[in-house]
UniProtKB/Swiss-Prot annotation:
Similarity comment text for this entry: Belongs to the LysR transcriptional regulatory family.
Record keyword Transcription present: yes
Annotated HTH lysR-type domain residues: 16-74
One function term, GO molecular function aspect: sequence-specific DNA binding
Alphabetical keyword list: DNA-binding, Transcription, Transcription regulation
Domain of life, per lineage: Bacteria
Biological processes annotated in GO: regulation of DNA-templated transcription
Gene Ontology CC terms: cytosol
Signal peptide: none
Organism of provenance: Haemophilus influenzae (strain ATCC 51907 / DSM 11121 / KW20 / Rd)
Protein name as catalogued: Uncharacterized HTH-type transcriptional regulator HI_0775
Database matches in InterPro entries: HTH-type_LysR_regulators (IPR050950), LysR_subst-bd (IPR005119), Tscrpt_reg_HTH_LysR (IPR000847), WH-like_DNA-bd_sf (IPR036388), WH_DNA-bd_sf (IPR036390)
UniProt cross-references to Pfam families, sorted A to Z: HTH_1, LysR_substrate
Length: 315
């Protein structure tokens, strides 16, 4: 079969270039309707007709059956040529794919925007592994809050962005795939008055002193919406872009609360703070996003696929 395909490639290169082979196959696939084929190929109908005539005259062979001047089917030679042409096109596409996969897709620069907290909680093992496996790729990691990252993605300042669902960007503009799911939880000092409760209600948080992420983080906006929705109005005494500062603040101040993703409690065990789940919690869903494009670079496709693969559940 490989020999047959190679011979077909040689015949195809000599008799028709790959572009003309695609034209020929498209004519057959469109039931010999030149008008429809030309529209699908974005070429003029006269150009298609001329290509057919020139080919048959040059090779002194008829590949199309005709009736009243119209193409109605394939001759025996045409059927063989159609079969060979499809093999050649497939082989050509495979060759191009393998060429770039084996070389260019693993070289270059890729910029990924990841919120600092997500970087620690979700990407701490995935990203170093990916970087070590691809030494010829220059990874630029932008640590920015997810809310600010939305603009970076839309302005083409990052190739990929890790955001939180709901991103509130039209699905016509971005591709978004969930890679991690958890919830937000309350973090507090063991000496806080709420420390004795095993589960916290939103009413418990009303008028409590609280430190939260600043407005560049989507968690900030999700929390503000949750407070409003649950008629809960805590006393926000400070906001910050540093999750470790928020955690340290509650460890050293028994009157202060903060709300962070639940995985932080699993990653950083300490007797200096407690973690309590919240009744009807705010979901914390991490998504891998990219702008919708007609064509992506091989490097963009490669890294996007590798990240999705890393977070795919193992069977």
């Amino acid at each position: 079969m490989l020999y047959f395909v190679k011979m077909a490639v040689l015949r195809g290169v000599k008799m028709m270039d790959i572009r003309h082979l695609r034209y020929f196959v498209s004519i057959v696939d469109n039931d010999f309707n030149l008008s429809r084929a030309s529209q699908n190929l974005y070429v003029s109908q006269p150009a298609l007709s001329m290509m057919i005539t020139e080919f048959e005259n040059r090779e002194n062979i008829q590949i199309f059956k005709r009736a009243s001047g119209k193409i109605i089917g394939l001759t025996f030679a045409g059927e063989n040529y159609y079969r060979d042409a499809k093999e050649v096109i497939k082989r050509y596409n495979d060759m191009r794919t393998n060429l770039y996969k084996s070389k260019d897709c693993k070289k270059g620069t890729i910029t990924i925007g990841i919120p600092p907290l997500v970087l620690s909680a979700v990407f701490s093992s995935v990203l170093p592994h990916l970087i070590l496996k691809n030494p010829d790729i220059n990874f630029i990691i932008k640590e920015i809050g997810a809310y600010a990252l939305k603009s970076e993605l839309l302005l083409d300042k990052v190739d990929l962005a890790v955001l939180l669902y709901p991103e509130r960007i039209s699905k016509n503009i971005i591709d978004s795939i969930e890679i991690h799911s958890s919830e937000l939880a309350l973090f507090l000092s063991p000496k806080h008055v709420l420390a004795k409760k095993q589960q916290i209600t939103w009413a418990d948080l009303h008028q409590q002193k609280m430190a939260i992420f600043d407005q560049t983080f989507m968690i900030h906006h999700h929390l503000k919406e949750a407070f409003e929705r649950n008629n809960c109005y805590p006393d926000i005494v400070l906001d910050s872009s540093c999750w470790d500062f928020l955690l340290s603040a509650v460890k050293t101040n028994k009157e202060l609360l903060t709300i962070l993703p639940l995985p932080m409690a699993e990653l950083y065990h300490s007797k200096e703070f407690l973690c309590r789940k919240i009744e009807s919690p705010v979901p914390w869903k991490v998504t891998l996003c990219r702008q919708r494009k007609t064509v992506y670079t091989h490097l963009e496709e490669y890294i996007f696929d590798k990240l999705l693969e890393a977070f795919r559940p193992t069977k």
